[in-house]
Amino acid sequence: IPEKVKINDSTFVAGDNFLLKNKQGQWELYVEGNPLQIGKITGSLTQELMQKQEAIFFNKVEDLVPSKTQQYLLRKFLAWYNRKIYLHIPEEYKAEIYGLSQFSSSNFSEIGEPYLRLLYLHGAHDIGHAMQDLMLVGCSSFAVWGDKTEDGELLIGRNFDFYAGDDFAKEKIIAFVNPSEGHKFMSVTWGGMMGVVSGMNDQGLTVTINAGKSEIPLVAKTPISIVTREILQYASTIEEAVAIAKKREVFVSEAIFVG
């Protein structure tokens, strides 16, 4: 992969790929290549942001579960619960997560090796949702068109209400991804996350996810953000999006809002 070059504190380049802070103070990422390249280049460019999010997330878990014994039991439970998650994630996305994990923090080895830790983190939203029906994850969105918008075209808005603390919400990344297979797409994400919670592809298809009421599942399956990523990358119509969603077994109820 191309080497990362630091231009200044808010601009990093690796070949044709880059990470920069725009005028609005938001991080923008452009990355291209095959799954492993996309993972490694994204990891290289966003390493600081990724390690920061990981620390914030695991510190938040420590706040919620301060007892060392309970933390140990939680780790054992999650390892058991996620034992089959790898069977439900497409190979290309496992390759991308593996590439990303090469740039993970070395501080959380007691939770798991970097690749497994990142795999689990992609299911954290789903597990949290299932365990508490956490309205920690109750996102809201709307769509208007016709005489409700200025130009009559479709307008979709959403609130991203997955709340893991103010610090976690600070460093969002607007990622533009040009994969070797499928459609180019953009999504609003954060360091270490290759799944999609809100995004749009170059076919004009948009997806957002909104939590629904769930039964507690017995074993982890496909994280919802991986399903929405697959939809953005491979669907150009609502029918194709529905077909992709139907072929995946997810482990919590979510409404996937496709426009």
Show which residues each predicted segment covers:
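N-terminal mature-domain region immediately after signal-peptide cleavage
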Residues: 1-239
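Short arginine-rich
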Residues: 249-256
